Amino acid sequence: MRRALLLAALLACAPPAFADRLKDLTTVAGVRSNPLVGYGVVVGLSGTGDGNSQLTQQSMQSLISRLGLSVETGDLKAKNAAAVMVTADLPPFLKIGQTLDVTVSTVGQAKSLKGGTLLMTPLMGADGEVYAIAQGNLVVGGLGVEGKDGSSLTVNIPTVGRVPRGGMVEKMVETPFLETDHLVLNLNRGDFSTAAAVAEGVNRTFGPDVAVALDGTSIRVRAPADPAQRVSFMSLLENVEVDPAPPVARVVVNARTGTVVIGGTVKVTPAAVTHGSLTVRVTEDQRVSQGASVVVGNNATVVAPGEPVVTPDSQVQVVEEPAKAFVFDPGVSLSSLVDAINAVGASPSDLVAILEALREAGALRAELVVI
């Protein structure tokens, strides 16, 4: 009897089939990356810089003046330098002195950043504060060459490069992770049923009234006040497994490529579909005939070859395919519908037209998204 009760308890606590971890379904409110941006100069280019760009010349003059040197803008040539924008994402909890990757993109007429070096560039957040400093040698995956006759060859994008670990954090971003007595989990895809399932799964693991669903996206979870315990609690929380609700029935159609993505819960009501197609073919051809010229002389007539004559020949052909009819039983899946349409050789455009018509008729039990 005791073994039976223990087995029943273990089965009750076991995660449901096809369950997902909370770390795959949710994010913690306030724990996110922050975009950084800065303006800088890349030097050391092999003649592929901005040339006589006034913006780059002024930037170089300002940079040189900060080093204690005085130079006129007209004396600077930007053939080996380029004005660039530097961007990066500052991950949460990154500490002062740690590094991050930065992306460098040209803003002027530079043809390539290959072989360049990014000079010290402050990276600012949306509040105007400097959070990191970027500097280092660029890694450029593209290639761009140009001949003296004006011919050029470009492979990939040579005007964008990266500096691996080229940014150093100078200021941390404060997060509310340790400031309140609770955490808020936000679903990646809002759904009331999934929010309720998450709250139920957390309460089943940590005890009643620990989590409560605020709406279809957010779930509030009580957390320990001690920072050390909160980190351990979060490591357990993000590994709680729940069974998310089935997604909303949705059909996504790419009208340009004919790609159709169908959710597993999509159904159609009883419907009859008739669809025919009209094909118009226009062919252009040219007929060439040898013209003839007549020469009369000495009581004789001579026919000599003349200039070739080109005559256009256009043909228009209209082909109307016989209409094809489909009848579907109640509750048939949309995948069966698509299989039936494809079996008769319908084109992707025909499939898109049929799906849109089913939606307008109210026979498609799903949201149709056309991209």
UniProtKB/Swiss-Prot annotation:
<dbReference type="Pfam" id="PF02119">
    <property type="entry name" value="FlgI"/>
</dbReference>
<keyword id="KW-0574">Periplasm</keyword>
<comment type="subunit">
    <text>The basal body constitutes a major portion of the flagellar organelle and consists of four rings (L,P,S, and M) mounted on a central rod.</text>
</comment>
<dbReference type="GO" id="GO:0005198">
    <property type="term" value="F:structural molecule activity"/>
</dbReference>
<comment type="function">
    <text>Assembles around the rod to form the L-ring and probably protects the motor/basal body from shearing forces during rotation.</text>
</comment>
<dbReference type="InterPro" id="IPR001782">
    <property type="entry name" value="Flag_FlgI"/>
</dbReference>
<dbReference type="GO" id="GO:0030288">
    <property type="term" value="C:outer membrane-bounded periplasmic space"/>
</dbReference>
<keyword id="KW-0975">Bacterial flagellum</keyword>
<dbReference type="GO" id="GO:0009428">
    <property type="term" value="C:bacterial-type flagellum basal body, distal rod, P ring"/>
</dbReference>
<keyword id="KW-0732">Signal</keyword>
<feature type="signal peptide">
    <location>
        <begin position="1"/>
        <end position="19"/>
    </location>
</feature>
<dbReference type="GO" id="GO:0071973">
    <property type="term" value="P:bacterial-type flagellum-dependent cell motility"/>
</dbReference>
<protein>
    <recommendedName>
        <fullName>Flagellar P-ring protein</fullName>
    </recommendedName>
</protein>
